[in-house]
């Protein structure tokens, strides 16, 4: 009996640890390098504020949604989603939202990488913005 108790105590934390790492493997990451279209520089800050506010209020599955500027005409956008469903919800919201036309009028997408395992359905929805989908092959996170 003691052996069974010992083994159950030994393996229970391992099973939780495995489950925890699996959930992290479900994350989907979007990496976008954007160029501000000439003549649109004055609307960038307001547009970014509106986009951030909208995503923060309406997309609980978004873990990170951050803009970085290297100059007044180059922006990097970093997005992390809990899982495929959250990423697809974001894409649907963006494509159907009021801010999408302003976004494409303001930014030229130079590169757009999608990291994580995505479905064919999501790839089809994103085809006008990117076809660069990269499933994880190996690695770890602490």
Where is each model-derived feature located?
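Hydrophobic h-region of N-terminal signal peptides that target proteins for export
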Residues: 8-16
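Amphipathic alpha-helical coiled-coil segments
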Residues: 98-103
């Amino acid at each position: 009996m003691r052996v069974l108790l010992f083994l159950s105590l030994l393996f229970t934390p391992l099973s939780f640890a495995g489950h925890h790492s699996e959930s992290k493997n479900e994350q989907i990451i979007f990496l976008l390098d954007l160029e501000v279209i000439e003549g649109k520089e004055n609307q960038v800050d307001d547009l970014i504020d509106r986009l951030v506010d909208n995503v923060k209020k309406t997309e609980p599955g978004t873990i990170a949604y951050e803009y970085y500027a290297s100059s007044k005409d180059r922006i990097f956008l970093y997005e992390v989603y809990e899982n495929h469903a959250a990423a697809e919800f974001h894409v649907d919201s963006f494509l159907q939202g009021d801010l999408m036309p302003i976004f494409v009028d303001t930014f030229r997408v130079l590169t757009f990488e999608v990291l994580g395992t995505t479905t064919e359905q999501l790839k089809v929805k994103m085809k006008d913005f990117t076809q660069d989908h990269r499933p994880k092959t190996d690695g770890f996170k602490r």
